[in-house]
Amino acid sequence: MKKMKRLVAVLLAGIMALAMLTACGGGSFTPTSDVEKAEALYMDAFNTALGTNYENDADLEKLAKQVLDDSLNEDGTLKNGKGMIFSENAGNSVYRVVTILAQQGNKKVPYGITSEELANKDKVIVNVDQTTKNTTTGLAVGAVKKGDKIYVAIAMTKELKLN
């Protein structure tokens, strides 16, 4: 009987330790910096608009951040000769398109969000046309901080096949 009690106690201790380990860490990612919060906010918004559940693709995120760094001055304005949209042929009818988010009412001016504005936003609504919904095969959001504002770019892979 003593051996049985001891065995049950050891098993119970093992189960409790396992439960504690699975409850700690390894859970969902919680953004900590304002840049990460902006990326998570817009990733959720675009997944909702597209009706998808894409993860933030690391290669596309890197491309989005590179486009932001290459296109924006330190004050968040566009550099001479740069535009709000970057696209490249990735081969096999697949294109990579990066769009810098624009200010409402002016598609040629990058939208910079402050930390205070970001803290007050829990949801963003974006509109996506049907063609984008039908052709998007990958998604990522990249953000960079310039001055006191965060600028966001959306990177997508699109499969454009002619029938």
Regions found by a protein language model. Name each.
Residues 1-2, 50, 61, 125, ...:
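Residue-level signal for functionally critical sites in structured catalytic/ligand-binding pockets
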Residues 1-11:
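Bacterial Sec-dependent N-terminal signal peptides
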Residues 19-23:
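C-terminal motif of bacterial Sec signal peptides marking the signal peptidase cleavage site
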Residues 26:
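Short, conserved catalytic or interaction motifs in soluble domains
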Residues 29-94, 135-137:
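Short, well-ordered surface patches within globular domains
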Residues 88-163:
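A well-ordered secondary-structure block
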